[in-house]
Amino acid sequence: MAKEFSRTRRIGQQLQQELAVVLQRDMKDPRIGFVTVNDVDVSRDLSYAKVFVTFFEEDKEVVQEKLNALIAAAPYIRTLVAGRMKLRVMPEIRFVYDSSLVEGMRMSNLVSQVINSDKAKQQQFGSVDDVTENDIDEADDTEGKA
């Protein structure tokens, strides 16, 4: 992996902050709604910036519509951000949906479900150490019939 230059990283951080402000305050497009800028990767030559965003929507179609609205507004957003940053050349902005937040929430929910299931089985059978495979199979069978 190539060495990351501190200037590229600093510009990425500043670009992330400025994009967050512009998207929150200056964008009036109702299709976009509330968007979070998670990360910005700037190319070494500063010609491109890949902007990772998330929305508080889980429906894939709605997320795609919002992402398309952002992509369509990218030149305008670039102009607004260029006015706020002191760069000779403003990177071309490319928006990418970051599903890591949604996946993290999904994984957290799955872990919570497993913990709750374990607690229910512990209450039903007593100590977890006393539970045998047959007890678990029987509990699964009775849950399936209910």
Curated annotation (Swiss-Prot):
It comes from the Bacteria. GO terms for biological process: maturation of SSU-rRNA. One of its GO terms (cellular component) is cytosol. One of its GO terms (molecular function) is ribosomal small subunit binding. Keywords: Cytoplasm, Ribosome biogenesis. Residues 122-146 are annotated as: Disordered. It is found in: Cytoplasm. InterPro entries: KH_dom-like_a/b (IPR015946), RbfA (IPR000238), RbfA_dom_sf (IPR023799), Ribosome-bd_factorA_CS (IPR020053). Residues 130-146 have a biased composition (Acidic residues). Pfam families: RBFA. Disulfide bonds: none annotated. Gene3D superfamilies: 3.30.300.20. PANTHER family: RIBOSOME-BINDING FACTOR A, CHLOROPLASTIC-RELATED. One of several proteins that assist in the late maturation steps of the functional core of the 30S ribosomal subunit. Associates with free 30S ribosomal subunits (but not with 30S subunits that are part of 70S ribosomes or polysomes). Required for efficient processing of 16S rRNA. May interact with the 5'-terminal helix region of 16S rRNA. Belongs to the RbfA family. Monomer. Binds 30S ribosomal subunits, but not 50S ribosomal subunits or 70S ribosomes. This is Ribosome-binding factor A. It comes from Shewanella sp. (strain MR-7).
